[in-house]
Curated annotation (Swiss-Prot):
Family statement: Belongs to the G-protein coupled receptor 1 family. Mas subfamily.
Designated name of the protein: Mas-related G-protein coupled receptor member D
InterPro entries: GPCR_Rhodpsn, GPCR_Rhodpsn_7TM, MRGPCRD, MRGPCRFAMILY
Primary location recorded for the protein, binned into one broad class: membrane
Transmembrane helix keyword on record: yes
Extracellular topological segments: 1-30, 86-92, 166-184, 242-260
Superkingdom: Eukaryota
Keywords, sorted A to Z: Cell membrane, G-protein coupled receptor, Membrane, Receptor, Transducer, Transmembrane, Transmembrane helix
Topological category with respect to the lipid bilayer: Multi-pass membrane protein
GO CC terms of this entry: plasma membrane
Expression (tissue specificity): Co-expressed in the small diameter neurons with P2X3 and VR1 in dorsal root ganglia.
Length: 319
C-alpha cells in the first residue's frame, strides 16, 4: 500500500501516437476509471442528499448507509484527483508529489473506513438474524451512530500512523513503514474481510431458508447487503492485496502497470456501485418511472419482509 513515497505507477508516461500497447491500455483503463469516478460521485452525493435532507422511509441501517456513502464519495474524489495528477502535468513536480501523497493517504483512509463500515453492516444484520429478540428489544438505541464514529476514528488512527512512518516528508524509514503496513493490512485482510464473508454467508443461508419455507421474496435489505458485499469483495479486493503483490512478488513493469490501473478501475467501480444497487433493489417494475428517488431508496433500506412494508421515519441517531 505504501511501497514508495510518491508511487505513481507510470512515471513519465504521456499520450502520444507512438505509445506501446501497454501504455495505450493503461491510459484507456485510467480514463474509464475517471468516468466511473464521476458517475459514482454523482450517485453517492445523491444518496447523501436523500438521507440527510429528505424525509424518506428509513431502516435502522440508514446511519450505516449514509456513512458508507460518505466514505465512497471521499474515496472517489481522491481517486479522480490521483488519476488527474498522473495523466496530466497539472502542478509542478514538488507540489504534485505532496498533493499526490496527501490524496493517496486520504484515499486509503476512505477505503479503510468503507471496508469497516460494510463489515459492520453485515455483522449487525447477522446479529439481528441470529438473535432477533435481543436485537429488537435490547440493542442500544444509538448503537449505529456509536459504531460508525468508532470505525471512522479507527480508520483515521490507522492511516495517521501509516502516514507518519511511510511518508518521506515526515519519517522516511522504509523498514518501519513495512512493519506498519504488515500489521494494518493483516488487520484488514485477516479480520475485516473474513468477518464480512462469514456474516454474509450466514445472512445468505438464512435468507434462502426463509424463502424456501415461507415461499416469498427475501427482504430487500438482505439483497442490498449481500450484493454490496459481493461487489466489494470482487472489485475492491485487488486494491486490498495490492501491497502484497508489490512487496513480495517480482512482476514485470508492464504487468505491475496493468495490475495497478485495473485494480484502481475495479475499486472505483465498487465505490460507485452501491447507489445503483439501492435504486435497482428498491424500485418496483410497475412504478419504476413514477416514483421519487427518496421512496425508492427508502424501500431498498426497509427492514421489513415483502408485503409488510410500513412507513417508518427514524432519525439517523435513533436507530
Amino acid at each position: 500500500m505504501n511501497y514508495t513515497p510518491y508511487s505513481s505507477p507510470a512515471p513519465g508516461l504521456t499520450i502520444s501516437p507512438t505509445m506501446d500497447p501497454v501504455t495505450w491500455v493503461y491510459f484507456s483503463v485510467t480514463f474509464l476509471a475517471m468516468a466511473t469516478c464521476v458517475c459514482g460521485i454523482v450517485g453517492n452525493s445523491m444518496v447523501i442528499w436523500l438521507l440527510s435532507f429528505h424525509r424518506v422511509q428509513r431502516s435502522p441501517f440508514c446511519t450505516y448507509v449514509l456513512n458508507l456513502a460518505v466514505a465512497d464519495l471521499l474515496f472517489l474524489l481522491c481517486m479522480a484527483s490521483l488519476l488527474s495528477l498522473e495523466t496530466g502535468p497539472l502542478l509542478t513536480a514538488s507540489t504534485s508529489a505532496r498533493v499526490y501523497e496527501g490524496m493517496k493517504r486520504i484515499k486509503y483512509f476512505a477505503y479503510t473506513a468503507g471496508l469497516s463500515l460494510l463489515t459492520a453492516i453485515s455483522t449487525q444484520r447477522c446479529l439481528s438474524v441470529l438473535f432477533p429478540i435481543w436485537y429488537k428489544c435490547h440493542r442500544p438505541q444509538h448503537l449505529s451512530g456509536v459504531v460508525c464514529g468508532v470505525l471512522w476514528a479507527l480508520a483515521l488512527l490507522m492511516n495517521f500512523l501509516a502516514s507518519f512512518f511511510c511518508v518521506q516528508f515526515w519519517h522516511p524509514d522504509k523498514y518501519q513503514c513495512f512493519k506498519v503496513d504488515m500489521v494494518f493490512n493483516s488487520l484488514i485482510l485477516g479480520i475485516f474481510m473474513p468477518v464480512m464473508v462469514l456474516t454474509s454467508a450466514i445472512i445468505f443461508i438464512r435468507m434462502r431458508k426463509n424463502s424456501l419455507l415461507q415461499r416469498r421474496q427475501p427482504r430487500r435489505l438482505y439483497v442490498v447487503i449481500l450484493t454490496s458485499v459481493l461487489v466489494f469483495l470482487t472489485c475492491s479486493l485487488p486494491l486490498g492485496i495490492n501491497w502484497f503483490l508489490l512487496y513480495w512478488v517480482e512482476l514485470p513493469q508492464a504487468v505491475r502497470l496493468l495490475y495497478v490501473c485495473s485494480s484502481r478501475f475495479s475499486s472505483s467501480l465498487s465505490s460507485s456501485a452501491n447507489p445503483v444497487i439501492y435504486f435497482l433493489v428498491g424500485s418496483q417494475k410497475s412504478h419504476r418511472l413514477q416514483e421519487s428517488l427518496g421512496a425508492v431508496l427508502g424501500r431498498a433500506l426497509q427492514d421489513e419482509p415483502e408485503g409488510r412494508e410500513t412507513p417508518s421515519t427514524c432519525t439517523n441517531d435513533g436507530v
